Amino acid sequence: MAGTSAESEAGQDGMEPVKPLEAELLVVTGMSGAGRSTAADALEDHGWYVVENLPPQMLGTLAELVSHAPQSIPRLAVVIDVRSKGLFADIRAALGALAASGVTFRVLFLDASDNVLVRRFEQGRRPHPLQGGGRILDGIAAERELLQELRDSSDVVLDTSGYNVHGLATAITELFSETGPVALRLNVMSFGFKYGLPVDSNYVADVRFIPNPHWVPQLRPHTGLDKDVSDYVLEAEGVKNFVDRYVMALEPVLDGYRRENKHYATIAVGCTGGKHRSVAVAVELSKKLAQYPRVTVTTTHRDLGRE
């Protein structure tokens, strides 16, 4: 947000400067129907502390409270919209007070074309907050006039016309996630069929086609985490080919999850008891999947030790 004119406005209005804020501060505003709620949800999902529908005059008070909070709040997002009615006119003065106090912040302005905004309001069967007794377009026009100066001075203007909910959430994540685009988190879980399927599994691989180390006396006491069992399992005919093909089959799934803004999935690998074959294959599968960009993998063994 530009500082010079805002700072002079703050001085003229006599607003008290706030204590310097250590948290990263993002002010989210924009046109009604442009996706503020979706943006707020996406920010909250990725570690931001989100305050919605805050009157602009309370920005300084909130910053002061956060600066004295006993528990650190590293990233704070504040959503402001025209439902604050008359108080919205004070937003530049409030932002000016923050700038004058040395608080670093960014302003995200969400926008969309008139046609898209009208369609969204009609689909939601709700009136525009500024239309009064007129048309939705009348409310949009009034809001554009009210927000034009703020839009022009915002740090980021994001046109959401071409986004659905998932696409907008992904765009927000890529803009404001601490580490850029969020990773897809995969949990590769070994299990034993005799104990039942994992209820939270998205995909299940059945590896009972592999010769069972249980019937090899020297391997029976060991598990798939031990090298002798792992070598026995992975060197069996067709196993490495199976793992490679399974990973290839998951590639379009991983891409689709990213497009749909899905961040978690569980891939279950099962054998009879969850001790030998599934454990070894789950470890190998995890190594392969971890090589993909923007993927983090954890490996768990649900039934290891149950026997």
From Swiss-Prot:
InterPro entries in the cross-refs: P-loop_NTPase, RapZ-like, RapZ-like_N, RapZ_C
Residues that bind GTP: D81, V82, R83, S84
Keywords, ordered alphabetically: ATP-binding, GTP-binding, Nucleotide-binding
Annotated binding of ATP, by residue: G30, M31, S32, G33, A34, G35, R36, S37
Claim: ATP-binding is one of the keywords in the record: yes
GO molecular function: ATP binding; GTP binding
Xref: Pfam families: PapZ_C, RapZ-like_N
Family: Belongs to the RapZ-like family.
Function field: Displays ATPase and GTPase activities.
Protein name listed in UniProt: Nucleotide-binding protein Achl_1824
